[in-house]
Amino acid sequence: MTGVHTMFHKRYEKHVENHQTRRAILSGIASTLGVSVMSPWTRVLEAAPATSATKAKKVIYFYMSGAMSHIDTFDPKPEQPSIQGDVGVVKTKTPGIMFGEHMTNLAELQDKLAIVRSMTTETADHSKARYWLQTSYPVLNSIRHPAMGAWVSNEMGKINKALPPFVLVNSGGNGHPGAGFLDPSLTPVPVADPEKGIENTELPSYLTDEVFKRRLSLADRIDAGFRERYAGYQLESYNQMYKDAVKLMGGSDLEAFDLTKEKEEVKERYGSSKVGLGALLARRLVEKDVRFVQVDYGGWDMHNDVAGSMAGKAPALDQALGALIRDLDSSGLLNETLIVLASEFGRSPAINQNAGRDHHPAAFSYVLAGAGIKGGAVYGKSDEKGHGIDEDPVGITDFNSTITVACGLDPNKEHFAPNGRPFKIGGGGDPIYDVLS
């Protein structure tokens, strides 16, 4: 383990140890003294600039699993040839702002994007960093925190009552935090392959609708005693999920998951890659008022041949995001849909002996677009070699709190887990108002 990794792991472990106790101790002291602790959010609100009334109603969240390189995408360093390596750069609409050479579509759309170039996190471990990004909290053995999609769906509710509020594309769901301690109905519906949609939704040829209804009725009668004996909100939630699934099987809204309904020229614009098809499916789902769609796209753990690996990975992402943003903008849905592009951490500016880049949590970049976002914004600054942060460092909780505010939600609202501990949607971070419209 490198010195950088050791430092961040120690900070991470200290964070886990202290994170949950500070507010409880302060609140306890305040209660004893008969006073209250002023919420930090109160001071944030006093200092926060006014934002427009346009807030996101839906979210499409692109998660780049494996840790995407900032040097080769949204924070290139062409003035440092040994750092930049063999991946070139491309100009954007803003003079002086450049992207990696494979981001040609997004360079043309830079006026619709907000780039955060000063992200930093506290661990270089994939699983821990992934969990922290998706939940706003470090891993704890005593509790499972909700993913951002579950948080947002819980607070904002369903729009389309016939469809699930939270869909997870290109992932089987293994290792995903899901609903955490929230209602089980907020668990994301997984779509492992966008071309197949939700599988096993059609009745087999030997089973008629009438026979299926009779079987459902019989199952309901058999389960009645169990439901009465073990009545509770969790059991009721699972029962409701089952009913919703049956309702979806017979409804027209299921077509939202069917990519065969799209014209071939549309599919070609998005591309045939997993992320291209995932982006197309995400567009169809938000058109049908699904609240939160997460699209996973793995393969960014480029320890070897980063230039060749980027050439095989980044163009598909650029094509998919470019097509999605243009389509949503054309239909007017970009005004109510927040698009997020994030990865668990970054990759080292220094190119290793295998022509790749290693794990690097100290500096990396994220992208926001759409509802609630100030297009053309570039926030924060990494140092001249992209190794650390020179200006305006942004932590994971700050970024997730920014998503929270973009959705019109209060990042200071507390939710209590079954063990009595308070948690917040964005983990109590400071929203980045400079990228909010």
Question: What do these predicted ranges mean?
Answer:
Residues 2-437:
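Ligand-binding pockets and gating/stacking loops
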